[in-house]
Protein backbone atom coordinates (compact mmCIF):
# COMPACT_ATOMS: atom_id res chain seq x y z
CA UNK A 1 0.00 0.00 0.00
CA UNK A 2 1.41 3.36 -1.00
CA UNK A 3 1.04 6.72 0.63
CA UNK A 4 -1.32 7.82 -2.15
CA UNK A 5 -3.64 4.91 -1.36
CA UNK A 6 -3.89 6.02 2.27
CA UNK A 7 -4.97 9.52 1.28
CA UNK A 8 -7.80 8.35 -0.96
CA UNK A 9 -11.21 8.87 0.56
CA UNK A 10 -13.07 5.71 1.33
CA UNK A 11 -16.18 5.08 -0.65
CA UNK A 12 -19.20 5.82 1.44
CA UNK A 13 -22.81 5.43 0.56
CA UNK A 14 -23.81 8.61 -1.21
CA UNK A 15 -26.91 10.33 0.08
CA UNK A 16 -29.92 9.51 -2.01
CA UNK A 17 -30.84 12.14 -4.55
CA UNK A 18 -34.49 11.17 -4.47
CA UNK A 19 -36.87 13.78 -3.16
CA UNK A 20 -38.39 12.73 0.14
CA UNK A 21 -42.09 13.16 0.68
CA UNK A 22 -42.93 15.30 3.69
CA UNK A 23 -46.40 15.71 5.06
CA UNK A 24 -47.63 19.23 5.72
CA UNK A 25 -50.26 19.67 8.41
CA UNK A 26 -53.25 21.57 7.06
CA UNK A 27 -55.92 23.30 9.17
CA UNK A 28 -58.80 21.04 10.14
CA UNK A 29 -62.17 22.72 9.66
CA UNK A 30 -63.92 20.34 12.07
CA UNK A 31 -61.60 21.58 14.85
CA UNK A 32 -62.22 25.25 13.89
CA UNK A 33 -58.55 25.72 12.88
CA UNK A 34 -57.52 28.58 10.61
CA UNK A 35 -54.29 29.78 8.99
CA UNK A 36 -52.88 33.06 10.27
CA UNK A 37 -49.83 35.28 9.80
CA UNK A 38 -48.08 36.85 12.79
CA UNK A 39 -48.27 40.65 12.50
CA UNK A 40 -46.53 41.67 15.71
CA UNK A 41 -45.32 40.33 19.02
CA UNK A 42 -47.06 41.92 22.00
CA UNK A 43 -45.08 40.30 24.82
CA UNK A 44 -46.19 37.95 27.60
CA UNK A 45 -46.73 35.12 25.05
CA UNK A 46 -49.26 37.23 23.12
CA UNK A 47 -49.17 38.23 19.48
CA UNK A 48 -51.34 39.89 16.86
CA UNK A 49 -52.55 37.49 14.15
CA UNK A 50 -54.05 38.30 10.75
CA UNK A 51 -56.23 35.28 10.03
CA UNK A 52 -57.26 34.07 6.56
CA UNK A 53 -60.91 34.93 7.29
CA UNK A 54 -59.92 38.62 7.43
CA UNK A 55 -60.16 39.03 11.21
CA UNK A 56 -57.24 40.39 13.25
CA UNK A 57 -57.07 38.41 16.49
CA UNK A 58 -54.95 38.47 19.61
CA UNK A 59 -53.11 35.17 19.70
CA UNK A 60 -51.84 33.33 22.74
CA UNK A 61 -48.95 30.89 22.71
CA UNK A 62 -49.89 28.06 25.08
CA UNK A 63 -47.28 26.63 27.42
CA UNK A 64 -46.98 23.42 25.42
CA UNK A 65 -45.69 25.41 22.41
CA UNK A 66 -43.67 28.04 24.25
CA UNK A 67 -40.38 26.13 24.34
CA UNK A 68 -40.88 24.05 21.18
CA UNK A 69 -41.33 26.75 18.56
CA UNK A 70 -39.94 30.25 18.53
CA UNK A 71 -42.47 32.42 16.77
CA UNK A 72 -41.45 35.65 15.01
CA UNK A 73 -43.19 38.33 12.96
CA UNK A 74 -44.18 37.07 9.52
CA UNK A 75 -44.46 33.40 10.52
CA UNK A 76 -47.44 31.39 9.30
CA UNK A 77 -49.26 29.52 12.06
CA UNK A 78 -52.46 27.58 12.69
CA UNK A 79 -54.73 29.32 15.18
CA UNK A 80 -57.90 28.13 16.91
CA UNK A 81 -60.33 30.97 17.73
CA UNK A 82 -61.87 30.86 21.17
CA UNK A 83 -65.51 29.75 21.26
CA UNK A 84 -66.62 32.48 23.66
CA UNK A 85 -64.39 35.36 22.40
CA UNK A 86 -63.93 35.30 18.64
CA UNK A 87 -61.31 38.09 18.70
CA UNK A 88 -58.83 35.84 20.56
CA UNK A 89 -57.14 32.62 19.46
CA UNK A 90 -54.62 29.99 20.55
CA UNK A 91 -51.61 29.18 18.34
CA UNK A 92 -51.27 25.43 17.93
CA UNK A 93 -48.80 24.98 15.03
CA UNK A 94 -45.97 26.87 13.34
CA UNK A 95 -44.94 26.22 9.72
CA UNK A 96 -41.36 26.09 8.45
CA UNK A 97 -40.33 27.97 5.28
CA UNK A 98 -40.57 24.93 2.93
CA UNK A 99 -44.01 24.14 4.34
CA UNK A 100 -45.14 27.74 3.71
CA UNK A 101 -43.91 27.45 0.10
CA UNK A 102 -45.96 24.26 -0.30
CA UNK A 103 -49.07 25.95 1.17
CA UNK A 104 -48.67 28.84 -1.30
CA UNK A 105 -48.28 26.47 -4.26
CA UNK A 106 -51.37 24.49 -3.27
CA UNK A 107 -53.51 27.62 -2.77
CA UNK A 108 -54.01 27.50 0.99
CA UNK A 109 -52.49 30.97 1.45
CA UNK A 110 -54.22 33.76 -0.41
CA UNK A 111 -52.20 36.64 -1.84
From Swiss-Prot:
The keyword Cell cycle does not apply. Residues 22-96 form the S1-like domain. Signal peptide: none annotated. The keyword Protein biosynthesis applies. One of its GO terms (molecular function) is translation initiation factor activity. Residues 1-28 are annotated as: Disordered. Keywords: Initiation factor, Protein biosynthesis. It holds the Pfam family eIF-1a. It comes from the Archaea. Belongs to the eIF-1A family. NCBIfam families: eIF-1A, PRK04012.1-3, PRK04012.1-5. Seems to be required for maximal rate of protein biosynthesis. Enhances ribosome dissociation into subunits and stabilizes the binding of the initiator Met-tRNA(I) to 40 S ribosomal subunits. PANTHER family: EIF-1A. This is Translation initiation factor 1A 1. The gene is eIF1A1.
Amino acid sequence: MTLADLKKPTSRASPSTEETVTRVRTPRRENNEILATVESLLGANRLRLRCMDGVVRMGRIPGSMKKKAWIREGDVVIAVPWEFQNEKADVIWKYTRPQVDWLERKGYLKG
